[in-house]
């Protein structure tokens, strides 16, 4: 079952990316290193509800 999720920057709290994930394979919150346009650098982005 794939669900749509939003990735939020951990340092500036801006929601920058929309993606999807398979809840059966990844039940935990997703964390990825992504580019933050506000800070102009790569930061950790976490899944939000």
From Swiss-Prot:
Gene Ontology CC annotations of this record: cytoplasm; ribonucleoprotein complex; ribosome
Q: Which InterPro entries match?
A: Ribosomal_bL33 (IPR001705), Ribosomal_bL33_CS (IPR018264), Ribosomal_bL33_sf (IPR038584), Ribosomal_zn-bd (IPR011332)
State the Gene Ontology terms under molecular function. Answer: structural constituent of ribosome
Q: According to the UniProt record, where is the region Disordered?
A: 20-49
Specify one Pfam family. Ribosomal_L33
Transferase keyword on record: no
Q: Which UniProt keywords apply?
A: Ribonucleoprotein, Ribosomal protein
Q: What PROSITE patterns does the annotation carry?
A: RIBOSOMAL_L33
Name the family the entry cites: Belongs to the bacterial ribosomal protein bL33 family.
Q: Which PANTHER family match?
A: 50S RIBOSOMAL PROTEIN L33, CHLOROPLASTIC, LARGE RIBOSOMAL SUBUNIT PROTEIN BL33C
HAMAP family on file: Ribosomal_bL33
Please state what the protein is called: Large ribosomal subunit protein bL33C
Q: Which gene encodes it?
A: rpmG3
């Amino acid at each position: 079952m794939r669900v749509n999720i939003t990735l939020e920057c951990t340092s500036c709290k801006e929601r920058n990316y929309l993606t999807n994930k398979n809840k059966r394979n990844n039940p935990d919150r997703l964390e990825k290193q992504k580019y933050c346009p506000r800070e102009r650098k790569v930061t950790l982005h976490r899944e939000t509800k």
